[in-house]
Amino acid sequence: MGQKVNPNGFRYGITKAHNSVWYADKMQFASHLLEDQKIYDFFDKKVRQLQIGNVQIKRNQNGLILIYVYTAKPAVMLGTNGENIKNLTKDLQKILKNKKANISIQVIELKKPDLNARLLAEDIAIKLENRGSFRLAQKFAIKAALKAGAKGIKTSVSGRLNGVDMARTEGYNEGEMKLHTLRQDVDYAATTAKTTYGILGVKVWVSLGEILSDEQKAKQEEMDLLNAPKDRRVRRGGERHASTKKN
């Protein structure tokens, strides 16, 4: 059987940037790593409430923890006069067990949330929990992603679908999805839907096209110009027609 690697981890350091960016010595590395995991787990629980698509963590030498939160609803994330940010900062300090932790949360708006695999997967999971059709939920997500400009999308739902005794997996695939091509910008997310029949697994792959360097872009533009159809010029007197011979 083929072993399927996580598309995000497969591309980190090549076409995708790491979510955690900092440097630490051997004495601090383990503690920083544990803190990052606690921060990610904290925001994972608030994905549906705040429509969080991605979280990135950066640290500087002064001990400042910069947390970039990409959300589809920045107004809900900020709250009135930034009250939600203050509350989130206090909650993080409690989780990290450090009331003096210097934490700065930066909210960034997702311009196209329908291209974010995490938000699409959560949307499918919410519909499944509300007893919606797993087929329609996937089709709506595919339609929304393609309309937003995705080159391709793949979805998968596994578990006791419709409450049957035998668990199975059903999914849809539309457009291009080159998982083996590292130049292909693929966003992947997996989540779970808690239904009365049990837990269903939801996976979403979104392809945003290939990431090309400047040289590759120039070559691609040249090829597009060469392959472009030439304008058909009509000669004077109109187009030529097949002449009929007179008997």
Curated annotation (Swiss-Prot):
Function: Binds the lower part of the 30S subunit head. Binds mRNA in the 70S ribosome, positioning it for translation.
HAMAP family reported for this sequence: Ribosomal_uS3_B
Protein name from the UniProt record: Small ribosomal subunit protein uS3
Organism: Metamycoplasma arthritidis (strain 158L3-1)
Pfam families documented for this protein: KH_2 (PF07650), Ribosomal_S3_C (PF00189)
UniProt keyword Coiled coil present: no
Higher taxonomy: Bacteria, Bacillati, Mycoplasmatota, Mycoplasmoidales, Metamycoplasmataceae
InterPro entries, A to Z: KH_dom (IPR004087), KH_dom-like_a/b (IPR015946), KH_dom_type_2 (IPR004044), KH_sf_prok-type (IPR009019), Ribosomal_S3_C_sf (IPR036419), Ribosomal_uS3_bac-typ (IPR005704), Ribosomal_uS3_C (IPR001351), Ribosomal_uS3_CS (IPR018280)
SUPFAM superfamilies, sorted: Prokaryotic type KH domain (KH-domain type II), Ribosomal protein S3 C-terminal domain
Matches recorded under PROSITE patterns: KH_TYPE_2, RIBOSOMAL_S3
Assembly and interaction partners: Part of the 30S ribosomal subunit. Forms a tight complex with proteins S10 and S14.
Record's compositionally biased regions (Basic and acidic residues): 236-247
NCBIfam families reported in the protein's UniProt record: rpsC_bact
GO cellular component: cytosolic small ribosomal subunit
Region (Disordered): 221-247
Domain KH type-2 positions: 39-111
GO biological process: translation
GO MF terms, alphabetically ordered: mRNA binding; rRNA binding; structural constituent of ribosome
Family: Belongs to the universal ribosomal protein uS3 family.
Keywords, in A-Z order: Ribonucleoprotein, Ribosomal protein, RNA-binding, rRNA-binding
